[in-house]
Amino acid sequence: MFSLALRARASGLTAQWGRHARNLHKTAVQNGAGGALFVHRDTPENNPDTPFDFTPENYERIEAIVRNYPEGHRAAAVLPVLDLAQRQNGWLPISAMNKVAEVLQVPPMRVYEVATFYTMYNRKPVGKYHIQVCTTTPCMLRDSDSILETLQRKLGIKVGETTPDKLFTLIEVECLGACVNAPMVQINDDYYEDLTPKDIEEIIDELRAGKVPKPGPRSGRFCCEPAGGLTSLTEPPKGPGFGVQAGL
């Protein structure tokens, strides 16, 4: 009787875990890296027949990239060649991934694995200006929420959306490595740091006007120097031998 009860309990736990595991899998598929699906689903704008090919100039760049690796290791170039495809096209449809696999002579799955792992690869179309707002702890403590709210209000979109004119895409990201200059955002390849809501509004206005705002801190400080100014290293360092006894 004890054995029957134990088996029944084990069966119930197994069924419960099975349901939980299925839900975890569903969540992971829905909320993969960058909020995108880990798996590919054909759409009218993203399928194996979506036109994509590298330009002649980029084919030359690919060969230059491949030469950085030992002979027979073309697969090592998957990351930079995917980046090249994204810079040419703005995002990575499945056809671009297939082209990368073809050019590097690797199975397509090897390219898919990389493209779905790294959040920097855009697997759906983005606007001309891809705005990535860091909301990890240091930025959050420096009020990154106000930056995100200002952007949503100014652009009229929510996180994960693109403006109707295809000019701006807004996403929320994890740490971008500029914690000392929090709060900050990355727009395309540029970092804008030490932001206030007024700063980010001005940046958007400049981009809309076709200008390129100056990257870096908006607070006036240089790079990541102390906010109150330098307290050490206030003059050029002395040369070799400084302070050494003359007799040595």
From Swiss-Prot:
Q: Where is this region: Disordered?
A: 229-248
Q: What is this protein called?
A: NADH dehydrogenase [ubiquinone] flavoprotein 2, mitochondrial
Location of this chain's protein in the cell: Mitochondrion inner membrane
Q: What class of enzyme is it?
A: translocase
Decide whether keyword Acyltransferase is in the record: no
Its GO CC terms are: mitochondrial inner membrane; mitochondrion; respiratory chain complex I
Q: Which SUPFAM superfamilies match?
A: Thioredoxin-like (SSF52833)
| GO biological process, alphabetically ordered | cardiac muscle tissue development; mitochondrial electron transport, NADH to ubiquinone; nervous system development
Q: What PANTHER family has UniProt attached to this entry?
A: NADH DEHYDROGENASE [UBIQUINONE] FLAVOPROTEIN 2, MITOCHONDRIAL (PTHR10371:SF3), NADH DEHYDROGENASE UBIQUINONE FLAVOPROTEIN 2, MITOCHONDRIAL (PTHR10371)
What does the annotation say about its assembly with partners? Core subunit of respiratory chain NADH dehydrogenase (Complex I) which is composed of 45 different subunits. This is a component of the flavoprotein-sulfur (FP) fragment of the enzyme.
Topology within the bilayer:
Peripheral membrane protein
Q: Which cofactor does it need?
A: [2Fe-2S] cluster
